[in-house]
Amino acid sequence: MDGLLVLADGTVFRGQGFGAKGTAIGEVVFNTGMSGYQEVITDPSYTGQLITFTYPELGNTGVNQEDLEADTPAVKAVLCRCLAPQPSNWRSSGTLEQWLEQHGVVGLKGIDTRAVVRQLRDGGAINGAVSTDGTSPAELLKQVLAAPSMAGQNLAERVSTTRAYRWSSPTAAAFDRRLQDQPVDRYRVVAIDFGIKRAILERLSAHGCDVEVLPAGSDADAVLALKPDGVFLSNGPGDPSAVGSGIALAKQLLSDPALPMFGICLGHQILGLALGGSTFKLGYGHRGLNHPCGGSGLVEITSQNHGFALDANSLDPQRVAVTHHNLNDRTVAGLELRDQPVFGVQYHPEASPGPHDADHHFARFINLMASRRNADKIERLS
């Protein structure tokens, strides 16, 4: 079946449809990773978006149950140059096309993805429509122009869990086997789910955390009632400045000067907003597996997926230290409080997909919780 991509500026790209038949409208973005398409498609941070893969081949390894970051795809549509008709991988349980059709996700193949990406790079991420049901370009453009911008949208509460639960890992996805052989103290961590990836939960667990997951709209009383050793603020989709409940929660928790806190991606931005900072929308975002980030004399190659960033000039330098920058455009990639055990990174140390350079941030979180526990013991003995 024939298909179309219609952008808000009126540009039309033609290709062949796959997956579910229908129309999807959302923000058109691109990911530059050469692998990990299943993790990307199921990452809740992509909610509401039409994802263009720059690597020309897609679907070569099929799909499986182990590489899901959520139960279902988060993206509204998938765009690619070439789709593999037959996967080749020992873990594959089906084709990407069948899986997308099963979950109602529209796909478009055979389009000039290089031209799409150049247009997004030069003009910025914009709304668009992918259609495989015969809807005319004129009608699609009308629907696209009526669709809301990603700016101002609180998507975190839409994708967050609706109930509290304790994480129990169904897979053995910890890539560092040394962690499994070491005796570790267990730490109780409360994770606020703004769209959390399973890989993050697995890395926290592998590093010695018993994780209690709470909905995005939780208040400080619900968090502190669980007597956490530390609090984790997760990744998630949408505009961070629109997540009012999350910002309010972070402000409340920051009033405890001894409570360790760690934020990733959206959670990092929420920390910055709670500290009086502001965010802005990036032109076309950072979405890929090889973004260099520098800080403290160390360069990490990182996995990233975000369309907003903290404004460094909005942060109080007397209280907040910017610890990392994205070395491609110098945007803020990490922060820490000078007088509290609180820090965040804009990228994904859990990878999935991507490099493992930044996994040490989980160990840092553990060390902060261990220091607090030891300080409490000394105080009780004195």
Swiss-Prot record:
Region of interest (CPSase), ranges: 1-184
GO biological process: 'de novo' pyrimidine nucleobase biosynthetic process; 'de novo' UMP biosynthetic process; glutamine metabolic process; L-arginine biosynthetic process
Domain of life of the native organism: Bacteria
Residues at the catalytic site: 265, 348, 350
Pathway: Amino-acid biosynthesis; L-arginine biosynthesis; carbamoyl phosphate from bicarbonate: step 1/1; Pyrimidine metabolism; UMP biosynthesis via de novo pathway; (S)-dihydroorotate from bicarbonate: step 1/3
Transmembrane segments: none
This protein's UniProt keywords: Amino-acid biosynthesis, Arginine biosynthesis, ATP-binding, Glutamine amidotransferase, Ligase, Nucleotide-binding, Pyrimidine biosynthesis
Keyword Nucleus: no
Record field: catalytic activity: hydrogencarbonate + L-glutamine + 2 ATP + H2O = carbamoyl phosphate + L-glutamate + 2 ADP + phosphate + 2 H(+)
GO molecular function, one term: ATP binding
Subunit structure comment from the entry: Composed of two chains; the small (or glutamine) chain promotes the hydrolysis of glutamine to ammonia, which is used by the large (or ammonia) chain to synthesize carbamoyl phosphate. Tetramer of heterodimers (alpha,beta)4.
Stored HAMAP family: CPSase_S_chain
Family according to the record: Belongs to the CarA family.
Descriptive protein name: Carbamoyl phosphate synthase small chain
Organism, as annotated: Synechococcus sp. (strain RCC307)
